[in-house]
Amino acid sequence: MKNIITMTLCLLVGSPAFAASSTLRDKTVMNIFELGIKAGKSQQYDEVASSNISSSLEAETGTLAMYSLKRKDDLNQAYMIEIYAGKEAYKKHVDSEQYKAFIERAPEIIDQKSKTDVTPQFLGDKRIVQNERTINNLVIVDVKPEHQQSFKNIVLAEMSDALKLEDGVLAMYAATDAENENRWYFYEIYASEADYQRHRQTPHFRGYIEQTSEMTTGKESIPVVPVFLRNKGAMQFDD
């Protein structure tokens, strides 16, 4: 991941119906941020991040989703995922009072920040109401160059089916590294662990695993727990 000062993540998304036009793709911006929290500042970080997320989702029509999550094995290692309707929506967020308050507190709470620039390939979600059962997954997959297009076709179809057919699948996002198109990032949200396990037994998921088993060179599943997840829901965009 590449160091950067800014701590935001942007995506352009489509309407509730699938949108795959070149216009949408050209406007889309997506970043994934990893943040190191200073020792003893984890609770303060959660409070500031949650306040920023709540205020932004309530006040900004173009802010479509903001997710705060942490590593299970190191709660001082955080991730922030944010989704906006476009560049103008992101600019409005950066100019907002809640974002400025977050940035003002950041130096006393955060000691490391990095960003991965990515290109969104699939963005789909439902309205999320987080509770103690909600889980999320963050996964990185490296695909063999010669299988990139086939992998993309298979995984996008699987994610679309999962959202349509499974009530417990709340959000699925896929993106590729802007500097290495063969590296894929997946962020998924499920209503519960039981819903995730049911998902793994579905024909579309098992078909995806079987069809892509020889297409990849590596997979890293980052152990994460949801801290504060908010979205507007009804997002569907595939490239």
Language-model-derived ranges and their functions:
Residues 28-36, 65-94, 132-142, 171-201, ...:
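Short, well-ordered beta-strand segments in beta-rich or mixed alpha/beta enzyme
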Residues 20-27, 67-76, 101-136, 171-181, ...:
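Glycine-rich beta-strand-turn "strand-cap" elements at beta-sheet edges
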Residues 24, 51-67, 83-116, 163-170, ...:
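An amphipathic, aromatic/His-enriched active-site/gating alpha helix that lines ligand/cofactor pockets
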Residues 10-18:
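Hydrophobic h-region of N-terminal signal peptides that target proteins for export
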Residues 36-47, 143-151:
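Short, surface-exposed ligand-recognition loops at beta-strand->loop->(often short) alpha-helix junctions
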Residues 131-172:
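Surface-exposed interaction/gating patches
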Residues 44, 48-51, 101, 150, ...:
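Extracytoplasmic/secreted proteins, especially bacterial periplasmic and envelope-associated proteins
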Residues 2-10:
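Sec-dependent signal peptide recognition
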